[in-house]
Amino acid sequence: MSKYLVYISFKPFIAQWLRHHFGDPVVFPAQSAENACIRHFLTRQPGSLPLTRGDDDVAICIPDSKQKPVVTYNYLSGNARKAVAECIEDTFRLQLWCDLADIELCQCTLLSAVRAWCEANGIDVEYDYTLKMRFQRMRNSYLKHGVDLRRRSRVRDNKNC
């Protein structure tokens, strides 16, 4: 783990999800897309700019690499931080979609499933409606273009049937 950190601001529920899954400070897996994105945008620190940290910012460890040693390359510009935040938000959306896409199978309401998902992923339940609406917008945007990703057939565990 690197002792160099970068601070990026996120929506509160994404910050909670990050800290729950990757610790505080956040340390991504070695070969992850997030680390690749961070490494891609790392540059030398321009001049003697001090690192500023906002109240809601999440501390993320900068991955070390042979091509860009963290001692020299430890700065992300404002736009680079936005790009890394987009990459992390995509990972969040992927997990939300994968975990809730087949919710029709369990015969419960979407809101109760989202609340359970929040609890399982370290997110305050106060964001349940926000995440429910996010999920519904994702699903509806596909449906609008004629792509129905909901399961239509019954999944059977028993292979004899």
PLM regions and their residue ranges:
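Short, charged amphipathic recognition helices of the HTH superfamily
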Residues: 101-121
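Short, basic interhelical loop/turn and adjoining N-cap
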Residues: 116-132
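Short, basic alpha-helical nucleic acid-contact segments in DNA-binding proteins
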Residues: 134-149
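Alpha-helix N-cap/helix-initiation sites
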Residues: 89, 107-111, 124-129
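Positively charged, polyanion-binding regions of nucleic-acid-associated proteins
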Residues: 84-105
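Intrinsically disordered, low-complexity basic tails/linkers immediately adjacent to helix-turn-helix/homeobox/MYB/SANT
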Residues: 148-161
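Intrinsically disordered, low-complexity linear regions
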Residues: 64, 134, 158-160
